[in-house]
A protein has these predicted regions:
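Short acidic/polar inter-strand loop motif in beta-rich domains
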Residues: 148-151
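Alpha-helical transmembrane segments
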Residues: 15-19
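Acidic, negatively charged sequence tracts
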Residues: 26-28
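Bacterial N-terminal signal peptides that target proteins for export
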Residues: 1-12
Length: 171
């Protein structure tokens, strides 16, 4: 094989390699491979997105007491929404919703978010947590909003230990 053929073959190989490797850049940051569903409870209805929904029970399995509903609610719309209620279908338990400060409704501002659970955030407390659900289950939850209506999803039920300790019913 002559020297010029070797150089030509080497150049062709280098070009082919760069085309293959650089073509991945054309996929953009919204490639299908990036559409991985998270392993936490999340859904969207209209302009409302609910992410990372959990029901956090007492730390000890035998302990009685309240449980907390935690989630982040995003409003991508142009008008504010009010979180009117949270229900757990199939149960008769009551969920008490309180804003982060003061009294009144929990409002999700247009283009904003509300975090339920944790210090300094709005809260949603299930008065009789153990009657509603058990650790390890998936509990159906319905968030009722003033404009969007019902937003339903299944939330993981976890005890207030580890990462969830600061978001649980006593937080």
């Amino acid at each position: 094989m002559s020297r010029s053929l070797r150089h030509g073959a080497l150049a062709a190989t280098a070009i082919a390699f760069s085309i293959v490797s650089l073509s991945a850049c054309a996929a953009g940051n919204n490639a299908e491979t990036l559409k991985v569903r998270p392993d936490n409870a999340a859904t969207s209805v209209g302009s409302i997105k609910v992410q990372n929904a959990n029901v956090i029970t007492q730390a000890e399995a035998e302990a009685e007491g309240p449980a907390a509903v935690t989630a982040t609610l995003f409003n991508d719309g142009t008008e504010a929404e009010v979180l009117e209620s949270i229900t757990l279908p199939g149960t008769d338990v009551r969920v008490t919703i309180r804003p982060a400060k003061g009294k009144g409704p929990v409002e999700i501002p247009a283009g904003g978010r509300v975090i339920l659970g944790g210090k300094g955030n709005a809260s949603a407390v299930i008065d009789e947590g153990r009657e509603a659900t058990q650790d390890g289950n998936v509990q159906q939850i319905v968030f009722k909003l003033s404009r969007t209506g019902d937003v339903a999803l299944g939330a993981n039920v976890v005890p207030a230990t580890g990462y969830y300790k600061d978001f649980g019913p006593s937080a």
